[in-house]
Amino acid sequence: MEKNEISEERRTQEKEKQHGHRLNIRRLGRKELTELLTRLGEPAYRANQLHRWLYSNQALRFEEMSTLSKQLRQKLASEWIIHPASLVGTERETTDASLVTGNPTAKFLIKLEDNELVESVLIPSEERITACISSQIGCPLRCTFCATGHMGFRRNLTASEITDQVFLLEKEAQKRHWRGLTNIVFMGMGEPLLNLDNVLESIGTLTEKDYQFSISERKITISTVGLPVEMDRIARSGLKTKLAISLHSADQLIRERMMPIAADITLDKLAKAINSYNSVTSQPVTLVYMLLEGINDSPEDARKLVRFAKRVLCKINLIDYNSIVTLKFKPGCSSSKTMFIQQLLDAGLLVTVRKSQGATINAACGQLATRPVR
């Protein structure tokens, strides 16, 4: 979160307090919890205890927090409330394939404290159960093929609103599939790197080793259009998360038409940022490439992708376009897709093809939107 956003948030909090409103303590990050308890005359370790109650035990009342003194619990209850996000809607895939496997993708509508809505997706398979979570309400980048970009941008999610999505989907995974989440992907609504402070805070909570829910950093993937400064910050943070870059074209003009941000972050700048990330982390990135008929699926497009991919340490993940009724894009045809893949393989590149899941309930890549797409 930028400094001006933080100051605006604090001004809002002070204004609400002056009007006698109790604020949601889950708005506060770990650092802010420490500052709060210090102001209340408590030792710093109390913040860790409070954080554990909120995010490991997922307490809903301060009275439950037995490791805190009664006086502190009463003080907190007089000024704060505990208000996690809530599940308000579910849509489940009912295709023949999903019914046969018994692993239907499910999309969840989640209501936040201010009544804003966000979507998350549970993607089960035989090997894993993946939570696809959002980092923003809407998205300011306005990629032309993406439903989220067309719904506009409302605000960043707080760290707790991000973790709440995971907690809600973990409960649904246990209930529906009798096993918990194995992977988390930041591939829902929004650009995670535009909300990096809260994304990193949420990852810190979700990977806390002795919490009731804890997942390895290596099981988390952050997807981005490729913001160089923020990519460098992730690389130097020491995080072991995976990084996926939404490339979609290795032709500068085509990429600009698909993704307006590409006018500022050119392919040369992106390659430089990826090389820096590779150098710092010694890890490859995944280049995500969505095939669109007549736009980026020609043999020449494949040749350009080969040239770009050979400039960086990467693997390539090809995905089909998931149709959106109000947009005119079409997925690449099977014959052009086959030839495209073969060109990449012949060039010695590592290629995977992502099986689309959730398209029939608008839960697949690029389809999430809590407002109509115009």
Swiss-Prot record:
Disulfide bonds join 132-365. It holds the Pfam family RlmN_N. InterPro entries: Aldolase_TIM, Elp3/MiaA/NifB-like_rSAM, Methyltransferase_A, RlmN_N, RNA_MTrfase_RlmN, rRNA_lsu_MTrfase_RlmN/Cfr, rSAM. The keyword Iron-sulfur applies. It comes from Chlorobaculum tepidum (strain ATCC 49652 / DSM 12025 / NBRC 103806 / TLS) (Chlorobium tepidum). This is Probable dual-specificity RNA methyltransferase RlmN. Belongs to the radical SAM superfamily. RlmN family. Its EC number is 2.1.1.192. It comes from the Bacteria.
